[in-house]
Amino acid sequence: HVRSRRQRQMCIRDSYRNTNYVPMGFAYDYYLTQTEYEETAKATRANLLMRALVLTDEDAAVYGKYLTHLPEGRREELYYESYVQDCRERRATAASVFQMNNSGFHAEITLEKENLVFFSVPYDDGFTAYVNGQEADIVEVDEGLMAVLCPAGENSIDFVYQPDGIRLSRALTLGGIVVWLAYTAYFVWRKRRTKRA
């Protein structure tokens, strides 16, 4: 049986399609503390991360009221079938819009209740988050990723990235240009003065 090039490409594409794909920016129903997460078997942690958001003990005290603490029984049933269900549940809470831009990314999400919205983007001090135009705290979750608290209803989320030290480097560059211009102007003035004399 001979296949056309297009049929082969479609077959290959379908072979590598992730049917459990979850878009960027979604909410959880459950949370787990970092301590509890570290006590679970390493082999099941990936599945657990699709079921519950991992918060530090300190962040759990602040943000735990927006989520339900994952019961111990739900920490054990981490089979492929339950993973598929967890992916389906995360997809149902996912952002309707996610766009990368030159300074970071933008997302839009509608929430039934106030909740943390998770982004699988590495946490970095250079990020500033804005929820509905207001600056918001970024929570470091899941061992180094980011989440931001959003109110119930429609939300517009922007993460703006500015590398650490960029303000200082811009100020130094601008200062250097000013010094260079003054230095150049001095020599031009001196040269003209010497020619007149």
Per-region residue spans from a language model:
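Active-site-proximal, structured, solvent-exposed surfaces of multi-pass membrane proteins
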Residues: 60-61, 66-197
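Catalytic cores of secreted or luminal carbohydrate-active enzymes
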Residues: 17-86
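Aromatic side chains
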Residues: 4, 16, 26, 123, ...
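Single conserved hydrophobic/aromatic residue that forms the stacking wall/gate
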Residues: 1-12
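Short, well-ordered beta-strand micro-motif
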Residues: 15-17, 149
